[in-house]
From Swiss-Prot:
Catalysis: reaction(s): an L-alpha-amino acid + O2 + H2O = a 2-oxocarboxylate + H2O2 + NH4(+); L-lysine + O2 + H2O = 6-amino-2-oxohexanoate + H2O2 + NH4(+); L-glutamate + O2 + H2O = H2O2 + 2-oxoglutarate + NH4(+); L-arginine + O2 + H2O = 5-guanidino-2-oxopentanoate + H2O2 + NH4(+)
Organism: Hebeloma cylindrosporum
Binding residue positions for L-glutamate: R123, Y457
GO molecular function term, any single one: L-amino-acid oxidase activity
Keyword Lipid metabolism: no
Record's description of how this protein is used: Ammonia is critical for agricultural and chemical industries. The extracellular production of ammonia by yeast (Saccharomyces cerevisiae) expressing LAAO4 can be efficient approach because yeast can avoid growth deficiencies caused by knockout of genes for ammonia assimilation. Moreover, LAAO4 is able to produce ammonia from food processing waste, soybean residues (okara) derived from tofu production, demonstrating that ammonia production by LAAO4 is a promising strategy to utilize food processing wastes.
Name the UniProt record assigns to this protein: L-amino-acid oxidase 4
Quaternary structure and interacting proteins, as annotated: Homodimer.
């Protein structure tokens, strides 16, 4: 998966167990509309429970006072871009010595131009665009528009989700095959009957999640909520429990009409996702299936950034510096956020960072939620539901191990049988500890091909186990990790361990779960989280002056676009209660997120008459004179 699933990472991992890959067959715009419908229904259902009574908003401090932005990741930087365009003063507080957060590229010292790997976000499944960077509607449209706004669309290069030459490998149960060759991988030894093997993992999984996706799409066409209602009836299920207690195979498969055994579910999970994925929410799996469909379907333009994903936050930071001077406070960890006087409704906000108190009119926090929970919030007046959400909302672990070799052996080398690897981009998959191998897409067709390989990309339980060997500071464990990874690579590629060892130059490994500034890789919702936790943290705290943002607070979480969407919503909340006269320019420059408007129907554009966001703010935050 891409990190943040572009970020922000689990990304879309499509493993073809049988000869054909599957997808939920919607075009890019329809997929985006389904996400909008899902988010709109969650928020609308919650908002409607609040009743019509509005509460007056405390008067805000006089205009001109700074907004504090916590975190210089992509969500914080995007918030700053929006505020700057509206002439709203701001200051960004960042705990580290760099911007970008989980957009992080490691460049190997003394390596060549393309000897780097993206530790965080690494790939961007954008909608189609013209030569000027005008993007068609789609799930990632806002990301594409950001590249264009910054003049970066020419820096995007093809990302090969599938190898540009020969297919990658699958190596499961000690059996190796090129992707698409269609091996059973000795599944009968696991007690998997031949009928299931013949049908294939992808068809079975689509049979389970596809009807939910289709029903959500039908809602859009018929202006109903039937599909949504059915999805919510099953929202309390994990993917595993749904297969165990609810799902029955379609009659067309010719299988017994019975729920799946644990053995079969484990088999599905192994080839479909990562270890433990099916313990997370069913809704999460459905949205994953909808997100981008089949790779290569023509609707998605997979891209990466020439030079690495860090180029994006670095470009934003330079843009902000050029337009408004130095608004960054670096190397300052936030330890407290709250009202200066919790008993006064017009009290300003105070943030303690780097041991110093800093005063703001409002605060937008883009800190990862596990990190935010370690901050002193006693004067922020979070309600019980919000406090529980910070404790409960799940983040998924993720690790990456990048290796610099002397040469790109995965392209130029050959295996023990003399078969050339011939891999350019794409991925290989295995049940060995390294799980996913990602071959570089940058440096292709240049005189400086990348010698760097993402030798292991893991998430969920697989990442937790590999992460135990990362960052220990002990040479013994570093050597153990190196030996494990090289041994796994040799098995997957049918080559000798020593062949790889002789070509190794350097190793860099990263564990997001044990990083004190993230405490996890990306939001990964469990059963029921959408209905409860998601709604509570889209509300502000501290008398409406503490706004939460970040990829976790979007239905598109774990992708860069989720961080952008939530930042857009947080800035809207701030403007609505402080300077609503700026909202027309806000919409003109930064567009609208359709999920925050009632489904207009009849081709009408979202407007103030159908603004779900305004309704949400009024009922959770109060009213102002507009």
């Amino acid at each position: 998966k891409s990190f943040f699933r572009s970020l922000v990472a689990a990304s879309l991992v499509i493993v073809s167990y049988s000869a054909d890959t599957t997808s939920v067959p919607f075009d890019a715009e329809s997929r985006d509309q389904i996400f909008q419908h899902h988010a709109r229904s969650v928020i609308s259902g919650y908002t409607n429970t609040l009743g019509e009574k509005n509460i007056s908003v405390p008067s805000s401090p006089p205009g001109g006072e700074r907004v504090g932005i916590l975190g210089a990741g992509i969500g914080g930087l995007y918030s700053a871009l929006i505020l700057q365009s509206l002439d709203v003063p701001f200051e960004i507080i960042e705990a580290s010595n760099r911007v970008g957060g989980r957009l992080f590229t490691h460049k190997f010292p003394n390596g060549g131009k393309y000897d780097y790997y993206d530790v965080g976000a690494m790939r961007y499944p954008l909608p189609k665009s013209d030569d000027k960077g005008n993007y068609q509607p789609g799930v990632m449209q806002r990301v594409g528009q950001l590249f264009t706004y910054l003049g970066m669309h020419k820096q995007l290069i093809p990302y090969y989700f599938k190898s540009n030459k020969s297919p990658g490998f699958q190596y499961f149960n000690g059996v190796r095959a090129r992707i698409g060759e269609g091996s059973s991988f000795d599944a009968p030894a696991l007690g998997i009957n031949s009928s299931l093997i013949d049908i294939g993992v992808t068809k079975i999984v689509n049979d389970a999640v596809g009807p939910f996706a289709q029903a959500l799409f039908d809602d859009l066409q018929k202006h109903t909520t039937t599909g949504w209602d059915d999805m919510m009836k099953n929202d309390a299920y994990s993917t595993r429990s749904y297969f165990s207690f609810k799902y029955l195979p379609s009659p067309s498969f010719g299988l017994p009409s019975e729920h799946f055994s644990t053995r079969v579910i484990n088999w599905l999970e192994t080839f479909d996702k990562s270890t433990g994925w099916y313990d997370r929410g069913l809704t999460e799996t459905v949205l994953e299936a909808i997100a981008f469909g089949e790779v290569g379907d023509g609707e998605v333009d997979w891209r990466c950034i020439d030079g690495g994903s860090h180029v994006l936050p670095d470009t934003i930071a330079a843009f902000l510096h050029k337009k408004g001077g130095n608004a960054f406070v670096m190397n300052a960890s936030v330890t407290a956020i709250g009202l200066e006087n919790p008993n006064k409704e017009d009290s300003p906000m105070v943030v303690v960072a780097g041991g110093q108190k800093r005063k703001y009119s409002h605060v937008i926090s883009t800190l990862p939620l596990p990190v935010l929970r370690t901050v002193d919030l006693k004067n922020s007046k979070l309600d019980i539901v919000q406090s529980n959400a910070l404790r409960k909302l799940q983040y998924g672990p993720s690790i990456k191990i990048g290796i610099l070799f002397k040469e790109p052996w995965w392209t130029t080398g050959q295996d023990k049988n003399g078969e050339k690897f011939d891999l350019v981009g794409g991925q290989s998959y295995t049940d060995l500890p390294i799980r996913t191998v990602v071959y570089p897409s940058y440096g292709v067709n240049t005189n400086a091909p990348s010698n760097t390989l993402i030798a292991s990309y893991c998430w969920t339980n697989d990442a937790e186990r590999m992460g135990s060997l990362i960052g220990t500071g002990k040479k013994t464990y570093e050597e153990q990790l190196e030996h494990l990874v090289l041994s796994n690579l040799a098995a997957v590629h049918n080559t000798d361990y020593q062949y790889l060892k002789d070509r190794l130059v350097d190793v860099h490994s990263w564990d997001w779960n044990h990083n004190p500034l993230t405490m996890g890789a990306f939001a990964f919702f469990g059963p029921g989280d959408f209905q409860d936790l998601y709604t509570s943290l889209n509300r502000p705290a501290a008398n409406g002056k503490l706004h939460f943002a970040g990829e976790a607070l979007s239905v598109r979480h774990a992708w860069v676009v989720g961080a952008l969407d939530s930042a857009w919503r947080a800035v809207y909340n701030y403007l609505y209660v402080t300077d609503p006269a700026k909202l027309p320019k806000f919409f003109e420059l930064w567009g609208k997120n359709a999920e925050w408007f009632e489904q207009p129907g009849d081709g009408k554009e979202p407007n103030s008459d159908n603004s779900l966001l305004e309704k949400f703010v009024r009922r959770t935050h109060g009213t102002v004179s507009v």
